[in-house]
Amino acid sequence: YTHIRFDILITEETLDLIESQIDVAFRITAKVSDSLIARPLLQVHSVLCAHPHYLEALPKIVHPDQLIQYACITHHSMQNTWTLSTQEQEPQNYPIRIVAQSNDAHALHQMCRNKMGIAMLPYAIVKDDLENRTLIEVLSNYEAPQMTLSAVYSSRRHLPKKTQEFIAFVIEHLKK
């Protein structure tokens, strides 16, 4: 597709696709606006993690009720709670003490690596750090809610063929 020109805008803000003249957006969210079409692409699993040096001077965290005693780094869309569950327990909101927020997951990742506190981050972003023990998983027996990465667009009726082909390409690529 050498004739296709990309204009890529990277933001974690929810923009009006029509007003911003965006053909397709990729969003990680539990739900999109009813006025948009969302094509689910994959599930995004998040984990709680922290730098080992941040945790070493603190009491061992064994239950989410303790999160309020720790510095927490969170996405700006989160309230003052994190929702966690186990196999035996329904999702429950636990209060957290927010010391830093960002609308960018990579910025949150760097804050976590810089020993600023505990963060809830997509596993795909922290996988290498967890394997290398640069970061360690916290409360590993608890799960964060699954989010969905979706291709989001305004209407099938007016979706340009090149956009349809691009979405099909992304879907095919993610299957590999």
Predicted regions, residues:
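Central regulatory/effector-binding core of bacterial HTH transcription factors
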Residues: Y1-D34
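Solvent-exposed beta-strand sheet faces enriched in polar/charged residues
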Residues: D7-T11, S85, V138, V152
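C-terminal regulatory
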Residues: L15, E19, K31-Q146, K176
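A cross-family signal for key residues in well-ordered alpha-helices
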Residues: F26, H109, K127, Y153, ...
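Basic side chains
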Residues: R27, R39, H109, R156-R157, ...
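A late-sequence structural motif
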Residues: L139-K176
